[in-house]
Amino acid sequence: MLADRVLVYFEDARRFYEEALKEFEEGVRRGDPYKVRDAAEKAWNAVVQATNALLLKLAGKLPSSHWERRRMLRELEAKMPEVRALMLRDRYGVREGHLHEMVFYEGVVDVEDIRYELGKVRAYLDDVGKLLGVGT
């Protein structure tokens, strides 16, 4: 069932976000930059999974790449004013740049910036949850 798969992806997003928060706090407490970087990657994956849920529900298809997610979000924004108003495509790209590329791959560990980004991930999940009709 499509609806079940949508919920599985969104639940994965929530779980990855919760794990990211735990791992981030543990990494900060221990002074472990690798834990913090892993937390950023989990937070990024929360965005990816939430986006998968949204695209599966609204477009009826799962994207096969980050590029395809951005394209599908752009197409949804063109068709749906409520999606366009949330600027999800832009937000998706920014989280990718900050969490996935800068923190995880490049190793830029600015604790306060990452904490700020984690809040942005939460807001993204909240907005996607509203579009899906599920709470976060």
Which residues fall in each region the model found?
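Charged alpha-helical initiation segments
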Residues: 1-34
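Non-transmembrane, amphipathic alpha-helical segments
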Residues: 5, 31, 35-39, 106-109, ...
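Charged, amphipathic alpha-helical oligomerization/scaffolding segments
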Residues: 12-19, 42-45, 116, 120-127
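Residue-level recognition of hydrophobic positions within alpha-helical transmembrane segments
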Residues: 19, 34-37, 41, 45, ...
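Short linear functional motifs in flexible/disordered or boundary regions
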Residues: 25, 32, 51, 58-59, ...
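Hydrophobic alpha-helical packing segments in soluble, helical-rich domains
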Residues: 36-60
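Long, charged low-complexity segments
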Residues: 55-136
